[in-house]
Each structure stands twice: as structure tokens, then as C-alpha cells.
């Protein structure tokens, strides 16, 4: 009977054996746990998306840089305070562009007590406690103006690494693009993380000045490369575009 029912459904829905096998590979009966959970950056939603594998069920949208009405994030006093801590120059910024989440580590292995996520549009890092999937802290980088370096950590989560993407003047004043090589700069910030408290310690964090290249992703070494950190860069020629003059646009013209 089961075979005949399956054959009937396949015929009614015009499904091949390959289609049915694909569905069976992702199906999880109610009450059965997924083998894996994925923590994915939500991009310009400003959130973190959590879903299961193989079921692909969405478990939660973790509110991070943007209010989430259905879970009350950004509406109670505690989460309002977290969002306000991400204000820049006194202005509340309740949106973000999340990129490259990373788990906390011990001895270079993921332990997953905490998740870190950066905001590419605004230079911020958020800390998410994975005991309850709640954002507990947002810190603003006072040096850089954008980031894309991910939020990867040193092997025992002593530091969270944040790197600028686009170079900008450190003095926050306007400078013409002709001063790019002389005035514009990038930076890599190492945020000190207090593992027991689950919070970034801003006062014990520091930044290193970088040339005005474009930085991409950063990570800390492990094993033989322990003690080193690595950041890949492009545009070492410090090209500044000029599409209005018939030159290639910024990233298309960079090496």
C-alpha cells in the first residue's frame, strides 16, 4: 500500500525518483533534531539567520543591528539599550549589513559559546550569546568607517579581529581624493574579549594603521602559524576610480 501511495503521488505530481530522493534527504519528521545548524549572515537585513541541515527549517532570525518586532528585539528596555550602544556620533542607526559571522574558539577549535558578526555598512561588531541566541553587545569602531574583515577570532578568543574595507581619513574631516595616498588610511582592530563576561572590553582593545589599500578578510593563525594574523588586500596601487573621466569604476579598475 505504501508503495502504491508513493507511486500515485509521484504520478499525480509528475515527480521522478530523483525528485523523491532529494525530498527524502531533507525531510525531518516533527520532533527530530537536525544534524547541523547554520548561522548565516543576513546581509542588509542586519540580522543573523539560523536554519537547520538537512531540513532547511528556519529556527530563528537573531535580531542584531535591526529591530525584530516578532521577538521584541528593540522594543524592551534591555534590547533598546543594546541597539543604542551601536549609535554613531550620537545618531541611532537601526539597520546594518551583516557579513561573515564566526564562533568563539578554544585551542583553535570552534566551541560555539558566542557568535560574532560585523556590520559592513557601519563599522560595528556584535556579540551574540548562543546560550539563548540573543545579541548582548554592539561596539562601534572609532577609527574606521566601514569594514569587511569578518569577525574572526584568535585561537582562544582573546581577540576579535575587525578590518576596514574602504580607506578614509582618520580625522573625520573632508579631504579631496587627490590626497588619497597622503591622508586616507585603513586599520585592523583587535577587540579584547572577556570570555567569562561574554563582552568585548573596549579599553583593552587596539588598532593598527594600514595603508589605503582595500582590505577584505582577516583571520588569526593556528598551529604552525599561531601568533600571526593575516589580512588579504587588493588595490595596492591605490587606484581611486574616475568613471566620470572615462576610467574604469573603482573595484573594476583595481588589481
Predicted features along the sequence, with ranges:
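Conserved beta-strand positions in repeat-built beta-propeller and related beta-rich domains
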Residues: 40-43, 115-120, 161-165, 229-234
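Repeated scaffold domains used in trafficking and secretory/extracellular systems
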Residues: 19-28, 68-76, 85, 91-107, ...
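Structural signal for beta-propeller blades
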Residues: 48, 123-126, 169-170, 188, ...
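A short beta-strand motif characteristic of beta-propeller blades
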Residues: 13-18, 57-62, 89-96, 134-140, ...
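Beta-propeller domains
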Residues: 41-86, 117-142, 181-183, 193-201
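Short, conserved, GDST-rich strand-edge loop motifs in beta-rich repeat architectures
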Residues: 25-35, 100-102, 112, 162-184, ...
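Short coil/turn segments that connect the beta-strands within blades of beta-propeller domains
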Residues: 34-36, 112-114, 156-158, 224-227
Amino acid at each position: 500500500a505504501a508503495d502504491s501511495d508513493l507511486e500515485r503521488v509521484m504520478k499525480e505530481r509528475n515527480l521522478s525518483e530523483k525528485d523523491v530522493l532529494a525530498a527524502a534527504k531533507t525531510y525531518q519528521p516533527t520532533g527530530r533534531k537536525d544534524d547541523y545548524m547554520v548561522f548565516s549572515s543576513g546581509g542588509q537585513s542586519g540580522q543573523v539567520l539560523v536554519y537547520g541541515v538537512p531540513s532547511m527549517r528556519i529556527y530563528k532570525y537573531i535580531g542584531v543591528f535591526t529591530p525584530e518586532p516578532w521577538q521584541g528585539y528593540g522594543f524592551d528596555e534591555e534590547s533598546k539599550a543594546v541597539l543604542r550602544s551601536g549609535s554613531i556620533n550620537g545618531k541611532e542607526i537601526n539597520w546594518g549589513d551583516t557579513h561573515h559571522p564566526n564562533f568563539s574558539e578554544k585551542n583553535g577549535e570552534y566551541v560555539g559559546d558566542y557568535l560574532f558578526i560585523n556590520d559592513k555598512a557601519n563599522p560595528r561588531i556584535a556579540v551574540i550569546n548562543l546560550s539563548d541566541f540573543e545579541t548582548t553587545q554592539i561596539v562601534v569602531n572609532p577609527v574606521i568607517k566601514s569594514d569587511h574583515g569578518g569577525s574572526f577570532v584568535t585561537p582562544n578568543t582573546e581577540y576579535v579581529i575587525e578590518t576596514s574595507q574602504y580607506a578614509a581619513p582618520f580625522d573625520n574631516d573632508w579631504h579631496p581624493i587627490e590626497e588619497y595616498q597622503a591622508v586616507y588610511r585603513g586599520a585592523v582592530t583587535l577587540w579584547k574579549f572577556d570570555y567569562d563576561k561574554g563582552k568585548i572590553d573596549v579599553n583593552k582593545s587596539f588598532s593598527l594603521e594600514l595603508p589605503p589599500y582595500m582590505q577584505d578578510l582577516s583571520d588569526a593563525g593556528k598551529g604552525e602559524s599561531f601568533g600571526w594574523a593575516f589580512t588579504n588586500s587588493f588595490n595596492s596601487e591605490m587606484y581611486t576610480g574616475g568613471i566620470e573621466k572615462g576610467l574604469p569604476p573603482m573595484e573594476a579598475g583595481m588589481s
